[in-house]
């Protein structure tokens, strides 16, 4: 029988997994002795600055939450001591903050894999995620792609109207006697 605390934990994890655009699964005891509280606090602070967070929970509860959200692909990654990094808004910034932390020399935190949207990625693909455009950049590219043809049409229509006006002005100039001006 599930306890109320476990039910609440699964509910919270389900909500967080639903919101997350990026889910990175890692072992937080990679070198055997595990991460210190100070290291985990530093990682959490860095991720929070970029719209992410780290959650440590039991694998069984994470699996239930993953199944609740349709992220069954996470199942093979959920074994052993597991920390889940969640990126909510700008996934490239969250991935970069995580990679920067990993490159700082902490061997206790080793990435097993990631889920970007509904795509399962191997651990080494996290670097590619850092190269994705931010949400604002992606929206700007989409708007630019949509606006470019529209501005081209406006330019063509504007040129056509101007050409008609130039032809009319030339005809008026032809019809007027040489001494008069319009």
Swiss-Prot record:
Q: Looking at the UniProt record for this protein, which Gene Ontology cellular component terms does it annotate, in alphabetical order?
A: cytosolic large ribosomal subunit
Q: Does the keyword Flavoprotein apply?
A: no
Q: Could you tell me the superkingdom of the organism this chain comes from?
A: Bacteria
GO biological processes: translation
Q: Name one GO molecular function term.
A: structural constituent of ribosome
InterPro entries referenced in this protein's UniProt entry, alphabetically: Ribosomal_uL10 (IPR001790), Ribosomal_uL10-like_sf (IPR043141), Ribosomal_uL10_bac (IPR022973), Ribosomal_uL10_bac_type (IPR047865)
Keywords tagged on the record = Ribonucleoprotein, Ribosomal protein, RNA-binding, rRNA-binding
Keyword rRNA-binding assigned to the entry: answer is: yes
Subunit relationships: Part of the ribosomal stalk of the 50S ribosomal subunit. The N-terminus interacts with L11 and the large rRNA to form the base of the stalk. The C-terminus forms an elongated spine to which L12 dimers bind in a sequential fashion forming a multimeric L10(L12)X complex.
Question: What is the purpose of this protein?
Answer: Forms part of the ribosomal stalk, playing a central role in the interaction of the ribosome with GTP-bound translation factors.
Q: What NCBIfam families does its record include?
A: PRK00099.1-1
Q: Which family does it belong to?
A: Belongs to the universal ribosomal protein uL10 family.
Q: Which HAMAP family match?
A: Ribosomal_uL10 (MF_00362)
By what name is this protein known? Large ribosomal subunit protein uL10
Q: Which organism is it from?
A: Chloroflexus aurantiacus (strain ATCC 29366 / DSM 635 / J-10-fl)
